[in-house]
Amino acid sequence: MQQQILERIEDCYQQAEAYFKRAFPRPTTQFTLRGRSAGTAHLQQNRLRFNPVLLRENSEAFLAEVVPHEISHLLCFQIFGKTKPHGREWQSIMLKLFKISPNTTHNFDTQSVKGKDVEYRCACGPIRLGIRRHNKVLRGETRYLCKRCHTHLTLA
């Protein structure tokens, strides 16, 4: 599947070079993204990262939508410089070059990549915190208050 992604990236770049009548440097591609994001484009490094779990579960949509979406970010940066991430320049590349609706988010099932929750307690009952917030509590970086009763959350 990763080879198909690399081939799709090359196809997209050939399409872009024909459309814009100029050459573009090919990005470094990694399959190391975790969490609920399908892909990210690192503009200054000319690098793409894809989520291998979501790729495996949604291969057709990755080829059709996610790869062009992320490449559009890199192309937008290389053509226009710094712009809004999903601004009109990016939308134009999505629509005119790739002929894809410029959606900013995917609608993949993310149950398999969902982060772990940890149960905390306050005066009014149990509250679940995501792993990132839980780790901040463990490191002593912060304490959280319940939005309802305004008491500090404690690990259950």
UniProtKB/Swiss-Prot annotation:
Gene Ontology molecular function terms on file: zinc ion binding
Cofactor: Zn(2+)
Residues covered by the SprT-like domain: 12-154
Record: residues binding Zn(2+): H69, H73
InterPro entries documented for this protein: SprT-like_domain, Uncharacterised_SprT
Subcellular location: Cytoplasm
TM helices/strands, residue ranges: none
Residues the record marks as active site: E70
Domain of life: Bacteria
GO biological process assignments: response to stress
Binding note for cofactor: Binds 1 zinc ion.
GO cellular component terms given for this protein: cytoplasm
Key words, A-Z: Cytoplasm, Metal-binding, Zinc
Family statement drawn from the similarity comment of this UniProt entry: Belongs to the SprT family.
Protein name, as recorded: Protein SprT
